[in-house]
Structures are given as C-alpha cells and as structure tokens.
Amino acid sequence: MMEVGFSLIQWLISSGADSPFIFGWLVTGSVGLLAVIYTFLKWQKKTSLNWVKAAAREKKKVWKRLRVPLSHHQWTDDYGYGQQPSTCCVCLYSLVPGQNVSNKASLSIPVHRCAVCGVAAHFYCSSSAAKDCKCVAQAGSDHVRHHWSERWVNMDDNADMTAFCFYCDEPCGIPFIEASPMWHCLWCQRLIHVKCHMIMSKESGDACDLGSLRRVILSPVHVKLNEANGVDGVLTTIKNELASIRGHVRRKRHRGKNGNGQSLNGKLLEDSVSDPVKTVVNGLVVKKLRRDRSIDCLKQVSDMPNAKGLQNGIGGHKRNKSAALNFMKKFSLVDLPPDARPLLVFINAKSGGQLGPFLHRRLNMLLNPVQVFELGSCQGPDAGLDLCSKVKYFRVLVCGGDGTVAWVLDAIEKRNFESPPPVAILPLGTGNDLSRVLQWGRGISVVDGQGSLRTFLQDIDHAAVTMLDRWSVKIVEESTEKFPAREGHKFMMNYLGIGCDAKVAYEFHMMRQEKPEKFCSQFVNKLRYAKEGARDIMDRACADLPWQVWLEVDGKDIEIPKDSEGLIVLNIGSYMGGVDLWQNDYEHDDNFSIQCMHDKTLEVVCVRGAWHLGKLQVGLSQARRLAQGKVIRIHVSSPFPVQIDGEPFIQQPGCLEITHHGQVFMLRRASDEPRGHAAAIMNEVLLDAECKGVINASQKKVLLQQMALHLS
C-alpha cells in the first residue's frame, strides 16, 4: 500500500504544471466516493429498519393465528444505547434520545430490555408491550412450536447459513432482491420470509426442532412452572405486585417532598400507582405516556438511576436482581427422556472484565433462560444444581475464571452425583490457565465475532470428557506469641506458589479489593500485574526463601537452589496466563516424566525472582525442575506469601501438605487431530451404553479414566 502511495506521489511530481489540477480531482473524487458510501450505508440501515417495522406490523396482524404460548417480557434497565436494538418494539420509534436532550441526561435515561429475548422498549412503553416473549415453560405440550418474531436484535451469534429463508432458501435481508420482511424463531434462530410462513405452516405445521443447538438447549416442554395456577398463586402474585407498587409510591412521595420527583408538565407521575389493585388487575405498572410528551418526560429524569459504574449497559438495580432470582425459583424439570443431556450454565458477572451481564443476555437468547444462572453473593451454584438434581446426564458450562470453576466443582462434589456432570469453561478471568489447558481459549475473545458463541456451544456438544486431579492442601500454622496454632484446608487444581510469584499476586489482590472498579479489563489487569512484578524486581522481598523454606517430596528432602525466590507446585501445564513451566515438548537432562493433569502426580519447579518470571512469560528462559511426587510438604519458618490457584494469602510459620483428593470430569474441546475426534466419539458410545444398561456409572467412570490416559 505504501509503495502505491509513493508511486502516486512520484507521478504527481513528474506531471509538472498539471499536478495541482490532478491532485484536486483526486481529492474531490475521494470525498465524493466517501459521501456515496456514507449515503448507501445510511440508506441500507433505514431500509433494514423499515423491514423490521414491516415484520412487526405483519406479526400483529396474524399473532392470534400463530397459537404460540404467551409470556411476559422480563424487563431490566439498560443504558447501552450503542448496542442493538435501537428501536422500541412497542411504538416502533427510535430508542436513542433526541438532539434536544442533553448528553448528560441521556446517559441517565434507561430503556427497558428483555432479559429473555433481547427486545427493547422505552420505559414508558414497556408496560404496553405485547406478551410475545418466548415461553420458557411449556410442560404438557407435545412439541415446541416455532416462536416467530421480528428480528429486533442483530444476533452476531447467527451463522452465515441462517441468513437464508428456512422455507425457500432465498437470501434474507438483502434490499436489492425482491423479498418480503422476515421473522426469526426465538428458539432455533432460523429466518423465514413473512410471505413464506403461511405456506410452510399449511404444508408442514409449525413444529420447532430447536435448531443446531437442540442437544444443549433445555426444551421448554420439559420445564414446569411451579407456582399454583389457583387462588394461592394469584394471591401471591397480587401480594408481590402490591408490595412493589407501595414501595414505588413511597419513593415517589419521598422525592416529591425533596423536590426531586419526576414530573410531566408540572405534575408528579403518581397517577399510575394511585390505585394499586386496579393496576394489578389490568397488568400495568406504569401508564403509557403519550408520544408528544415523551421528550418532556425524558428531560425530567433527576429521579432516574445514574449510569455511572454500570457495566455493559446492564442496570445494577437490586429489584432487577431479586426479580431474576424469583424468576429462576419458579421452575422444575419434568418428563425428560432418559438420554437427555441439557447444558447447565453458570455465569460469574464479576469475573475478569465483568462481562457477565452481556454474556447472560446472549445466552438467554440462544438457550432456555431457565438453564442459565448468574453466580453472586445472593446465589451460588446450588440453585442450578437443584434444578438438575433429578437429571441423570447433564453437562455444565462455567463462564468465569479459575476461581469460579473451583467454586462450581466444590458444589458438584458435595452432591455425590452417580454420574457427575463434566464441566466446560468459557474463560472470563485474567489468567484462565485451566481453560487454556482444556483448549477452550484464553479469554472472552473466543466468543467474539460472527457465530462464535453458537460455535462455542456446538463445540461443547462434541467435546471429549477428560479427568482432572484435585488436590487437598492442609495448612498448618504453628503457635506464636501473636497467633495460636491453627489448621486450615483448601483445594488445588492448577498450581500452588510460594515466594515472589505469590507476593505479586497478593499485592494485586489487595489493590483489586480496595478499588474493584479499576479492574474491569483483562488487558488493564495484566498491566497492573506487570507493574507489581516490576516493583518486586527492586524489592527482592523473597530473596531469603532457600533459608526460610524447605521442601519435602514423598518423604525425601529436596534441596532448593540458593538463588531461588519462589517455589511453584504444578498440576497443569499452564501457569500465569499460559506459561509452560515443565515444558514437556523440550529435551531435558533429568529423568522426570512428562506432566499430565490426571496422573495423580505433581511437579515442582523454582524461579529466580520477578525478573525471571518476566522472561518466562516471553519464552526467554526456563524454570528449574526440582521434583515430581504424590505428597508434597513445604515447611515455612517465617511468614511468606502463598497463592493457591490465584488466591493469595500470608502463610505464617508452619507447613503446607499437598495430597491427592480425587478426580473430576472436565470437558475438553475436541482437537482436529484423529485422537481428539476419537475421544469425543468414545464418550458418546459410553454414554449410550450406560443409557441402555450395558454398563453402569462406576464402569463408565473407569473406562473414561483409562480413555483420558491413552487419548489425551
């Protein structure tokens, strides 16, 4: 490209007197071309929006004939105007505030976005929205019906093949081709021309097979709503609604006394809640405002929640969280076929870049929201495991860091499942070492781009089951003048470090605890981690480690080199964001075996300080291999920083004893190599054999262990 530019400049110089004239024409032509492209893109966007509106109008005309189960939208506050959709699904007007609304005010004006299907509406329009959300519980139905809807959300998760009509195989959404507006199914994500729908429904009906993700989607025909449909259920609903409305009235009155109430033409907006019983019976919480007053209403937003501190356009209101928790408690699973293998999803909203809410919405659109759970201080993995307590075969996807994975594995182990569910990982943390080893990627970027999340879910469906060793760490602290003798216990699945690496992790952890809002990016987190490492290069606080720490492996004392500032005990082949410390692929002059995450053996290496860690990161050095063994004891004579799977703490004088605890089932993405496909196929064969009673759960576990050893 630069060569072309230099050639053009030389040609203009050689043109002599005509060069200014030629240059002017080139500039004019470039500006004109950009104007044409801009106009075309704007026209294309307007045309697409008109098609969506046309599809919405067509759906309203035939909605009663579609015979789809009705369901209310699950509205949450959303401040992300830059994200799709940009049009209100009720009034069909833009969701972006007008020019006469200040930028500061527009940031605090929420829209309502459905957490289930992704449509959005003005906060004053949402109460009038049609009950056309996908029904997540349809127990008693013979089959799932297509839930056709206008395509408000531009789903990047749709593969290229879904850009064609499900019935006629003609392209959808291309303005130059004569075609009708399109609908898309909220379950299988297929597209169909509106004009083709009537023909298809007459010929083959409207049964939906859930599309390419049918094996991981929890079918709504097997989900039952627990709340009674009788008087008790109605009274409970009315009671909850009345409590919510009374709280709304009290907040309005309080704001009115302080002069901060939201107003419209000088009047407080309390008329919508003046008669709570009437409001509940009519199913309305806020009356629909007239369109000619919308801008006035948007200007008076002093009582609306502030957008500062919210992540990914998702509101952080407690009422949204409590509503989500109540929503998940309503359901149970019934009549699942014996070979059903639904995917149970756990999302840690605070992991890594705090992308959990955005990912939660995307997964709700692709899967059944009943099978997606958000982990936090109010809800742990038990809620999801309770839902699947009677499901013999299911799989688990953990969206979070290594700490979140350990949390879920602990909860699974406590359940004592006859066939424990294997676990896949969608990495949201900073290091994501276990995710790297299992081939699931190094960060959230693995599901960015066209069709990536859909492809990721399909990879889970075809993943191979492998084993992962879990280790028990017994922490003993000797009694001192300041501290009495104590004994603790933790689990380890990745690595344990003591010395310089743990000190860096400890300082990083303390900073994140003090100011968590500054740690919202994986890239920034790594920069801060590097900053702490650079500081330790100068401090060398762990230079006396060889004299304060001694190592015992399988009952034998192991000498620690005098220049060591850190010891690292490894269970997997990835450390600190992808560093291979044991280096199986290199030749070594020792007699140690290769490293494996399910051989019930640990590896021990040492590092020479933070500078050495930095060189390891970029592949300019190697860690020194010290030992392999099944029982590791680390004796400490003075306080030293320790980290277990990234969780740092200060170890007082005492002993760390690491012993094998057990093995857990993990899902490993099938590689392109023949062995990877063979492992995935063998998993299917073993599961089918167990379903048919040929083998039992314990026999399957033994065979999986042997297969993991030979095919990994």
UniProtKB/Swiss-Prot annotation:
Tissue expression remark: Expressed in rosette and cauline leaves, flowers, siliques and roots. Highly expressed in young leaves and at lower levels in older leaves. In young seedlings, expressed at the root-shoot junction zone and vascular bundles of the cotyledons. In older plants, expressed in root tip, central cylinder, root hair, leaf mesophyll cells and guard cells, sepals, filaments of the anthers, stigma, valves of young and early adult siliques and hilum of seeds.
Keywords noted in UniProt: ATP-binding, Endoplasmic reticulum, Kinase, Metal-binding, Nucleotide-binding, Plant defense, Repeat, Stress response, Transferase, Zinc, Zinc-finger
Residue ranges covered by zinc fingers (Phorbol-ester/DAG-type): 72-133, 145-208
Inducers of expression: Induced by cold stress. Induced by wounding.
Description of the deletion phenotype: No visible phenotype under normal growth conditions, but the double mutants dgk2 and dgk4 exhibit defective pollen growth and seed development because of non-viable male gametophyte.
Source species, domain of life: Eukaryota
pH dependence, entry free text: Optimum pH is 7.2.
CC terms in the record's Gene Ontology section: endoplasmic reticulum
Broad class of enzyme this protein falls into: transferase
EC code: 2.7.1.107
Gene3D superfamilies reported in the protein's UniProt record: 2.60.200.40, 3.30.60.20, Probable inorganic polyphosphate/atp-NAD kinase, domain 1 (3.40.50.10330)
Subcellular location per the Swiss-Prot or TrEMBL entry: Endoplasmic reticulum
GO molecular function list: ATP binding; ATP-dependent diacylglycerol kinase activity; zinc ion binding
GO biological process: defense response; leaf development; phospholipase C-activating G protein-coupled receptor signaling pathway; response to cold; response to wounding; root development
Domain DAGKc, first and last residues per copy: 338-479
Catalytic reactions of this protein: a 1,2-diacyl-sn-glycerol + ATP = a 1,2-diacyl-sn-glycero-3-phosphate + ADP + H(+); 1-octadecanoyl-2-(5Z,8Z,11Z,14Z-eicosatetraenoyl)-sn-glycerol + ATP = 1-octadecanoyl-2-(5Z,8Z,11Z,14Z-eicosatetraenoyl)-sn-glycero-3-phosphate + ADP + H(+); 1,2-di-(9Z-octadecenoyl)-sn-glycerol + ATP = 1,2-di-(9Z-octadecenoyl)-sn-glycero-3-phosphate + ADP + H(+)
Record's function text: Phosphorylates the second messenger diacylglycerol (DAG) to generate phosphatidic acid (PA), another important signaling molecule. PA is required for plant development and responses to abiotic stress and pathogen attack. May be involved in the accumulation of PA during cold stress. Involved in response to freezing stress by modulating the accumulation of PA. Exhibits high specificity for the unsaturated DAG analogs 1-stearoyl-2-arachidonoyl-sn-glycerol (1,2-SAG) and 1,2-dioleoyl-sn-glycerol (1,2-DOG).
Record note on quaternary structure: Monomer.
Family: Belongs to the eukaryotic diacylglycerol kinase family.
Protein name, entry field: Diacylglycerol kinase 2
Protein source organism: Arabidopsis thaliana
Lineage: Eukaryota, Viridiplantae, Streptophyta, Embryophyta, Tracheophyta
Gene expressing this chain: DGK2
